[in-house]
């Protein structure tokens, strides 16, 4: 989604250029809006260095404004058709906490191996064909892949080009199947009524629901709009844990210590209805326990949102939050 023209973006650009010079087939697809998070965009530098680069859904021409909200939020990298990377991380300096950036962002990204890598590649190839007209096919892009372990995984490519709401149905299905526990982190939390109801019903069935959120969101209007829903869920028995800075951009969900959902999707209208997203569901107890350990570390640093009238906020803030909640489909 985002590929910034900063120190780390330029390091990626240089590495990609060296790969292209070695004869590696390199294709880079950046969302048109995501490419403009830093100006000048890094697209020109990539193209001038010999890296085949394209912008997804260019929407700045007046006759294309109606497509402005349809963004590719996917974060996919595939190497030699055999090793994949996906999760929540963009290419920008703010993700490198060791450099002490001015606006640090904590995130979680995964390396993926085995047959599921072909599903990452298919999602990219489909977007590349749509954008450029070039078809990526053959063993260079899709080599034969063999199982490497016991985990069962499936890629979930979702977007507004389909009538079947895959991400929403996966989330609803996971909540309905949960028997003991559900833990998840989502930086932007604006679930629709179906998901709100599913969370409440899971609590009534005795499922322990824990939601991890940053105390301060990098998008203020989203933070305000999310507060009424979080307080409503806290009153219904969900445990809401708010973590201190840095801002946590992690997107991951664990159910019953056996199922993990990872990828780019948030619990908000953009991910559920407007964006092109890519997630991976994994049935693997070892991975689930590892992710839960990370989530437990986050929870240990945070504080629980206490349910109750006002939750200590002045009434004017409640009015502001409720008003912004009305606009959540547009945030």
Question: What do the predicted segments below correspond to?
Answer:
Residues 1-331:
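Charged, low-complexity intrinsically disordered terminal segments
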């Amino acid at each position: 989604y985002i590929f910034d023209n900063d120190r780390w973006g330029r390091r990626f650009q240089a590495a990609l250029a060296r790969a292209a010079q070695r004869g590696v087939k390199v294709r880079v697809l950046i969302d048109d809006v995501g490419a403009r998070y830093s100006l000048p965009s890094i697209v020109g530098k990539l193209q001038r260095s010999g890296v085949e680069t394209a912008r997804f859904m260019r929407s700045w021409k007046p006759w294309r404004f109606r497509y402005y909200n349809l963004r590719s939020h996917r974060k996919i990298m595939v190497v030699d058709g055999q090793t994949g990377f996906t999760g929540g991380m963009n290419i920008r300096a703010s993700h490198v906490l060791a450099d002490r950036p001015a606006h640090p962002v904590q995130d979680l990204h995964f390396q993926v191996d085995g047959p599921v890598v072909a599903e990452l590649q298919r999602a990219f190839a489909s977007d590349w064909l749509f954008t450029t007209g070039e078809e990526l096919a053959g063993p260079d892009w899709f080599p034969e892949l063999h199982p490497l372990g016991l985990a069962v995984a499936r890629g979930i490519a979702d977007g507004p080009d389909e009538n079947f709401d895959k991400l929403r149905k996966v989330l609803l299905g996971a909540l309905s199947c949960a028997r003991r526990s559900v833990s998840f982190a989502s930086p932007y939390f604006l679930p629709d009524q179906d998901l709100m109801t599913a969370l409440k019903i899971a609590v009534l069935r005795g499922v322990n629901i824990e939601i991890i959120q940053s105390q301060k969101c990098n998008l203020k209007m989203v933070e305000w709009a999310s507060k009424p829903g979080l307080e409503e869920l806290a009153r219904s028995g969900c445990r809401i844990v708010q973590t201190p800075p840095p801002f946590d951009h992690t997107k991951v969900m664990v159910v019953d210590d056996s199922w993990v959902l990872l990828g780019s999707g948030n619990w908000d209208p953009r991910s559920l209805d407007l964006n092109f997203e890519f997630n991976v569901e994994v049935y693997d107890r070892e991975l689930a326990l590892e992710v839960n350990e990370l989530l437990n570390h986050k929870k240990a640093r945070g504080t629980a949102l206490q349910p109750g009238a006002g939750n200590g906020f002045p009434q004017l803030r409640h009015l502001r939050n409720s008003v912004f909640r009305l606009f959540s489909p547009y945030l």
